[in-house]
Amino acid sequence: MNILLSNDDGYHAEGIQTLATRLREAGHCVTVIAPDRNRSAASSCLTLMEPIRVHQLGTFDYSVIAGTPADCVHLALNGLFETSFDLVVSGINHGANLGDDVVYSGTVAAALEGRHLRLPSLAVSLVGKQSEGHLFGNNHFETAAQVVLDVLPKLVDMALPRQILNINVPDLPYSAIKGMLVTRLGQRSPSAEILKSQDPRGSTIYWLGENGSAIDNGEGTDFYALAHDYVSITPIHADMTAHHAIKVLSEML
């Protein structure tokens, strides 16, 4: 397959480099285009008010200077390359993209951007203990890469254009994974309050509070799958219409 690979942790992150290596070893043609720095939680932000610069780092490797994940995929699918791609893969993200995380996630946003050319897309995340955006533990990126290799043939068989799968993989050895579950997005409680402090010069600064804990995490959710050592696979789409409210709202107005 001809695969476009991006992420939000940056070109030099271990996750994307591990996945690129494994996909190429499996015989896939992989073009990597990723931000030159960490752009976690950039969501679908696009750079519109200034020019974008792209650096070529290898035959099929590129970084976008100060770009976002959505910038990377948008550029790749809209004229930067002459190549025709079969699939967009985003990841391996260093941390979870569960429940409400997908709204903010640059990893998921890169996959969503693949819909422009009706391409199926995968957003892949490794879920372990996390603090301040960094994973702690064994960091089994090889496990997540193998899961992607397991899923790819099945995705081809589905033959569904614009299908987006949000995949979260437990940070465990591959042999310890119990299987894969198709799930829905769970839900987190509201984030913790902001943290207020002062910089060395006495100016007030703020940090956003930590993610809320899972409150909708029952059987069938992505949170449940990860808590029980399963890979979570959630089909998602970009249509944000609240279809159930259309009739009620029409009658009210």
Swiss-Prot record:
Q: For this protein, what does the record note about how its cofactor is bound?
A: Binds 1 divalent metal cation per subunit.
Q: Which GO terms describe its cellular component?
A: cytoplasm
Q: Name one GO molecular function term.
A: 3'-nucleotidase activity
Assigned keywords, A-Z: Cytoplasm, Hydrolase, Metal-binding, Nucleotide-binding
State whether keyword Transmembrane applies: no
User: Which metal ions or organic cofactors does this protein require, according to UniProt?
Assistant: a divalent metal cation
- The domain of life is Bacteria
UniProt cross-references to Gene3D superfamilies, sorted A to Z: Survival protein SurE-like phosphatase/nucleotidase
Q: Which Pfam families match?
A: SurE (PF01975)
- Localization (cell): Cytoplasm
Which residues does the annotation say bind a divalent metal cation? 8-9, 40, 93
EC number(s) given by UniProt: 3.1.3.5
This enzyme catalyses: a ribonucleoside 5'-phosphate + H2O = a ribonucleoside + phosphate
Explain the purpose of this protein. Nucleotidase that shows phosphatase activity on nucleoside 5'-monophosphates.
Q: Which family does it belong to?
A: Belongs to the SurE nucleotidase family.
Q: Report the protein name in the record.
A: 5'-nucleotidase SurE
User: Which gene produces this protein?
Assistant: surE
